[in-house]
Design a protein with these regions (language model features):
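Generic, low-specificity signal for short hydrophobic/alpha-helical stretches with a mild N-terminal bias
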Residues: 16, 20, 108-109, 137
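General beta-strand structural signal in soluble alpha/beta enzymes
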Residues: 46-49, 69-71, 104-105, 139-141, ...
């Protein structure tokens, strides 16, 4: 739970976000999740033609700028296509290797791993929870990053006119998120 301005919000859990299959080009389920989150919390948002999601929370004065957080909505694993079509969740298993804890996605039909850790569902998770935590913030969620940054290349530049800086939450290497749980 998160208390903001005397209101209590249920924070989005990482597990909720990781469970959503979102193969590149088939990201409707995660976009729908983000849109529903915005509606639930009364956040201003819009989608562009590519289905990038742009969110604004709060107001700024004329001489101020918004901070902005950014994440991408797609993953690279083809075995998720069937799960997306059937609107199935990815099973999340926690495994322990000595002192290390690792979250892995599992395909329920094949009982085999799917996904590469938190790329970039951790970014989506962080951005959504920051929208709850801060009074003034913009967030952009780009589609098809894993197949040539198609969403960000066609981003609405006007959304960023009043942005002072942006922070992107994406991992530099395979399984980077799993390594951060040590």
């Amino acid at each position: 739970l998160c208390r903001i301005n005397k209101k209590i919000y249920v924070m989005v859990t990482l597990k909720e976000v990781l469970e959503i299959p979102s193969y590149s080009g088939m990201e409707d389920l995660v976009v729908e999740f983000i849109v529903n989150f915005c509606k639930k919390h009364g956040l201003d948002y819009y989608l562009d033609d590519k289905k990038n999601v742009y969110v604004t929370k709060g107001k700024i004065k004329k001489d101020e700028y918004f901070p902005c957080v950014v994440a991408h909505t797609d993953t690279v694993h083809r075995d998720q296509k069937e799960m997306i079509l059937n609107r199935e969740k990815i099973t999340i298993k926690e495994t322990k290797h000595g002192k290390k804890t690792k979250l892995m996605g599992w395909n329920g039909a094949t009982d085999e791993p799917t996904g590469i850790g938190g790329d970039d569902k951790v970014g989506v998770y962080i951005c959504l929870n920051m929208l709850l935590e801060f009074d003034t913030l913009k967030a952009a969620f780009f589609v098809e990053e894993e197949i040539g940054m198609r969403g960000s290349r066609e981003a609405d530049p006007n959304f960023f006119n009043d942005v002072g800086y942006a922070i992107q939450f994406d991992g530099p290497t395979r399984n980077w998120f799993s390594k951060t749980l040590m």
